[in-house]
Protein backbone atom coordinates (compact mmCIF):
# COMPACT_ATOMS: atom_id res chain seq x y z
CA UNK A 1 0.00 0.00 0.00
CA UNK A 2 1.44 3.45 -0.89
CA UNK A 3 2.61 5.63 1.97
CA UNK A 4 3.53 9.31 1.93
CA UNK A 5 6.53 10.45 3.97
CA UNK A 6 8.57 13.64 4.00
CA UNK A 7 12.30 13.53 3.36
CA UNK A 8 15.23 15.88 2.96
CA UNK A 9 17.73 15.42 0.13
CA UNK A 10 21.30 15.80 1.41
CA UNK A 11 24.56 14.84 -0.27
CA UNK A 12 22.82 12.70 -2.88
CA UNK A 13 20.71 10.81 -0.33
CA UNK A 14 17.02 11.11 0.60
CA UNK A 15 16.71 11.20 4.40
CA UNK A 16 13.23 10.43 5.76
CA UNK A 17 11.89 12.77 8.44
CA UNK A 18 10.07 9.91 10.16
CA UNK A 19 10.58 6.20 10.75
CA UNK A 20 9.96 3.99 7.72
CA UNK A 21 8.99 0.32 7.88
CA UNK A 22 11.42 -1.10 5.32
CA UNK A 23 13.92 -3.92 5.34
CA UNK A 24 17.57 -3.11 4.62
CA UNK A 25 18.17 -3.16 0.86
CA UNK A 26 14.46 -3.16 0.00
CA UNK A 27 13.76 -1.46 -3.33
CA UNK A 28 11.05 1.22 -3.48
CA UNK A 29 9.71 3.72 -6.00
CA UNK A 30 9.78 7.41 -5.07
CA UNK A 31 7.53 10.16 -6.43
CA UNK A 32 9.08 13.59 -5.84
CA UNK A 33 7.01 16.62 -4.89
CA UNK A 34 8.58 19.82 -3.56
CA UNK A 35 6.96 21.38 -0.52
CA UNK A 36 7.04 24.87 0.95
CA UNK A 37 9.24 25.61 3.94
CA UNK A 38 6.06 26.87 5.64
CA UNK A 39 4.97 23.25 6.03
CA UNK A 40 8.13 22.58 8.05
CA UNK A 41 7.08 25.35 10.42
CA UNK A 42 3.74 23.62 10.95
CA UNK A 43 5.66 20.41 11.71
CA UNK A 44 7.27 22.34 14.60
CA UNK A 45 10.86 21.87 13.48
CA UNK A 46 13.39 23.89 15.46
CA UNK A 47 13.76 27.39 14.02
CA UNK A 48 17.47 26.76 13.40
CA UNK A 49 16.62 23.77 11.16
CA UNK A 50 14.02 25.82 9.28
CA UNK A 51 16.54 28.60 8.61
CA UNK A 52 19.10 25.99 7.47
CA UNK A 53 16.55 24.61 4.98
CA UNK A 54 15.73 28.10 3.73
CA UNK A 55 19.45 28.80 3.13
CA UNK A 56 19.83 25.50 1.30
CA UNK A 57 16.81 26.22 -0.92
CA UNK A 58 18.15 29.69 -1.70
CA UNK A 59 21.61 28.28 -2.50
CA UNK A 60 20.06 25.75 -4.89
CA UNK A 61 17.77 28.40 -6.45
CA UNK A 62 14.70 26.40 -5.44
CA UNK A 63 12.99 29.40 -3.90
Swiss-Prot record:
Q: Is-annotated flag, keyword Membrane?
A: no
Q: Which UniProt keywords apply?
A: Toxin-antitoxin system
Methyltransferase as UniProt keyword:
no
Record InterPro entries = AF2212-like, AF2212-like_dom_sf
Name the job this protein performs.
Answer: Possibly the antitoxin component of a type II toxin-antitoxin (TA) system.
Q: Which family would the database say this protein is a member of?
A: Belongs to the UPF0165 family.
Tell me the protein's name. Answer: Putative antitoxin AF_1084
Source organism per entry reads Archaeoglobus fulgidus (strain ATCC 49558 / DSM 4304 / JCM 9628 / NBRC 100126 / VC-16)
Amino acid sequence: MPKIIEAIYENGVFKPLQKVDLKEGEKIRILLKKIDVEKFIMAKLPEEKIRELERRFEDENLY
